[in-house]
Curated annotation (Swiss-Prot):
Protein's UniProt name: Protein unc-50 homolog
Native organism taxonomy: Eukaryota, Metazoa, Chordata, Craniata, Vertebrata
InterPro entries: UNC-50
Keyword Iron: no
Organism: Homo sapiens
Modified residues (Phosphoserine): 6
Disulfide-bonded cysteines: none
Listed GO CC annotations: Golgi membrane; nuclear inner membrane
A Pfam family this chain is assigned to: UNC-50
Family, per entry: Belongs to the unc-50 family.
Main location: nucleus
Annotated transmembrane regions: 83-103, 116-136, 164-184, 188-208, 223-243
Length: 259
């Protein structure tokens, strides 16, 4: 059995729900269970979530092999434990406070920046990207012979979180140690270091996203998800030639947000 949700029509005259409706009810129940566990920290496996975070840097394929195992044992691709999301949120809060400190922001400015980053950059943009990728993958990437299967929205969101974590660590943590004394010095070395960190971070996001969708056996042509590497490398080269410092732009944007 392919690890996905079957959507074959099984409508009967006796009023029994077809498989599509049943899948929706099942998805709703799983979503409710996931949200309920957000407030039950003792039920979360933080050790396993931390292990996943480590392997997203060293061997992201191993993380997606665990998604296969979850599908076989719990009949769903998406995580049923919000521990990863909780740890990611903690990382995001701590690193954003660090950004506020490095940019010499006051207490209330840092809190305002934190709300912007968490609610808009992480949650809002994350929901938008997950929904877009969920639609594209189901609309254009499902194999013709596998039309009875679809990508779970929760899985699309998990793929985004997986890809977002390395980007967060590189741009919101590692970069902090270089901002004031290297990156923002308005020199070639400054924007070389800063823009290279951006190249690695965004490249990681693209690659981990590709791995997430290529792990689904009922999808085709997932290699197209690697195509953004071409404009990314082109943009990187142009930025060095034109002296465009991505991190300087980000810092200016953050300061503008909290005015």
């Amino acid at each position: 059995m392919l690890p996905s949700t079957s959507v074959n029509s099984l409508v009967q005259g006796n009023g029994v729900l077809n498989s599509r409706d049943a899948a929706r009810h099942t998805a709703g129940a799983k979503r409710y269970k996931y949200l309920r566990r957000l407030f039950r920290f003792r039920q979360m496996d933080f050790e396993f979530a931390a292990w996943q975070m480590l392997y997203l840097f060293t061997s992201p394929q191993r993380v997606y092999r665990n998604f296969h195992y979850r599908k076989q044992t719990k009949d769903q691709w998406a995580r049923d434990d919000p521990a990863f999301l909780v740890l990611l949120s903690i990382w995001l809060c701590v690193s954003t406070i660090g950004f506020g400190f490095v940019l010499d922001m006051g207490f209330f400015e840092t809190i305002k920046l934190l709300l912007w980053v968490v609610l808009i950059d992480c949650v809002g943009v994350g929901l938008l990207i997950a929904t877009l990728m969920w639609f594209i993958s189901n609309k254009y990437l499902v194999k013709r012979q596998s039309r009875d299967y679809d990508v779970e929205w929760g899985y699309a969101f998990d793929v985004h979180l997986n890809a977002f974590y390395p980007l967060l660590v590189i741009l919101h943590f590692i970069q902090l140690f270089f901002i004031n004394h290297v990156i923002l010095t308005d020199t070639f070395i400054g924007y070389l270091v800063g823009n290279t960190l951006w190249l690695v971070a965004v490249g990681y996001y693209i690659y981990v996203t590709f791995l997430g969708y290529s792990a689904l056996p009922f999808l085709k042509n997932t290699v197209i998800l690697l195509y953004p590497f071409a404009p990314l490398i082109l943009l990187y080269g142009l930025s060095l030639a034109l002296g465009w410092n991505f991190t300087h732009t980000l810092c200016s944007f953050y300061k503008y947000r909290v005015k």
